[in-house]
Amino acid sequence: DPEGDRVTGSADAIVVLNAGSSSIKFSTFRRAGRGLERELRGQVSGLGTVPRLTAKRGGAPIVDRTLSAEGLGHAEALDILLEFVRAELHGEVLAGVGHRVVHGGLEFMEPTRVDAAILERLARYVPLAPLHQPHNLAAIRLMLERLPGVPEIACFDTAFHRTVPEVAQLFALPPRFAAAGVRRYGFHGLSYEYVASVLPSLDVRAAAGRTVVFHLGNGASMAALQGGRSIGTTMGFTAIEGLPMGTRTGSLDPGVLLFMFDELGMSVREVERLLYHESGLLGLSGLSSDMRDLLASDAAPARLAVDVFCYRARRELGSLAAALGGLDAIVFTAGIGENQPEIRARICRDAEWLGV
């Protein structure tokens, strides 16, 4: 193709990007019959510090190298990543690029092809997802410039929760606030959608029944699935609500914010930094936002942070089980959920009354 990557009838490669604040994760897929087969997965990590490119093909490492001793910005990292992917495609034509976008509000309920006008609309949600949305959109913007003939498709974390009943979406505020978009949206929807898609192959009864999914990573949330559809989740208007996270508070009495403003004299920006970057496991422990560090530590504040995390997860489990009217299955996913059996055990141990 004269424009390099324009879609044609023979286009058979897809790239998927998840651009975050300190890393850009990617996968490539090849068309295989009526489905897709993943070929590569990897990431550029350490943005802002020591960037590193790692990638695997079918589970076997094919690259692991430091990119720069002086740091890279997102644009430079994406250019390096794009060059690497093109080389690994060995001449295959790129059919499209998929992007994780955290917030789509009420107007984006399904995967959407992005152009400049759509980007402008998505930018309205940056204040509601300041840790993620700017980086998601920056990656799309760059790909539109680098690959002008290739569709850029945004897939939204909020979209999966469109099935949540209105009573679970609304805050107890006058209707004008809901009309302005102040409601509970929920996040991590792409993760929950994947769980819902594979659960039938693991347990048909659970997939058709009542499941609580724990997405426990640096960002943490839970969702109640009824027959694979979301009916409730712990995150809300923003990705702060719900469980304590690596550096985020989780749910907080709004009166605490009033106290910070009125009595402590904190500014909006100071409170924002506290809520998003200085709280959660890091704030409680004074040590680390990484659950692995806390579990390895004998320090009392580290143990307390783990205790609070597990307690809040158990409490939310009870709440979501009540919304479901019972419980048939529990699923754990994401970094902590998949790799920390001690956390899984501590959450489940005190949930025996639910049949766990």
Name each model-derived stretch:
Residues 328-346, 350:
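Glycine-rich phosphate-binding loops at beta-strand->alpha-helix junctions
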Residues 273, 280-284, 291-323:
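Adenine-nucleotide phosphate-binding core of ATP-dependent small-molecule kinases
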Residues 85-132, 151-153, 159-170:
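Short beta-strand-loop/turn "lid" adjacent to the catalytic site in phosphate-handling enzymes
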Residues 83-95, 199-205, 317-328:
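Phosphate/pyrophosphate-binding loops at sites that engage ATP/ADP/AMP, CoA/4′-phosphopantetheine
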Residues 160-261:
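Glycine-rich phosphate-binding loop of actin/hexokinase-like ATP-binding domains
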Residues 253-256, 260-287:
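Oxyanion-binding "anion nests"
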Residues 14-16, 23-71:
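Short glycine-rich, Thr/Ser-proximal phosphate-binding strand/loop in the N-terminal lobe
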